[in-house]
Amino acid sequence: MIVGNYGIDFLPREGDVRDYNSALILGADGQRVGRYDKIHLVPFGEYIPYKNLLFFARKLTGRVSEFTRGDQRKVFRLGSPQGGAHRYGVFICYESVFGNEVREFALLGAEVLVNISDDGWYGDTSAPWQHLNMARMRAIENRRWLLRDTNNGVTAVIDPYGRVRQSIPRHAIDALPAQFAFRSDVTFYTAHGDLFAWLCAILALGTVALAGRKLLRQWMASSQVQKSQV
């Protein structure tokens, strides 16, 4: 079982308490397997950037913006009804937006991806559907099944080709029995991240630079011809 959790660490030596936006992983026996603390926090929603400069923001956001950033991506081994254990990569809400970060779970050996999300912030807008489509991209990039569980968004089972195989409508309280498979192959994107995109960007900039240089030479040559005619 994987559930959203308010993680708390007590640090008696420092006299401090740290709060985390966490996912708690429980085994079939009900015992705790581990906890994942969200790493990519939402600015002003989960933490205040540049606290010293934006000191007034604390009064506006309250305690909701005091989460501590997690420091490690983890993959959890859970038993299967068919026997054996499989590796799950669990990430939280907004983290599904960042492909270069989600791929690290696959690199760590995750055979299936799990995204738990609170989409209640968005209301009845297109945002929950956009969030779903971003999760579909993560499934395609890493060629993994992706199980998406939301409180008020689109709960869905997504296959490695980004197709939504099963889903629960928004605002519905329901359970979704799902069939999915475990995969361990490594895609180009999983291995290299946004390398291809960066190469395309460099190629595009180089093409623009060469075209601009050619136009500049033509303009200079035309200017010289006009001056010589005068």
Language model segments and positions:
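Enzyme catalytic cores with a strong preference for nitrogen-chemistry domains
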Residues: 1-230
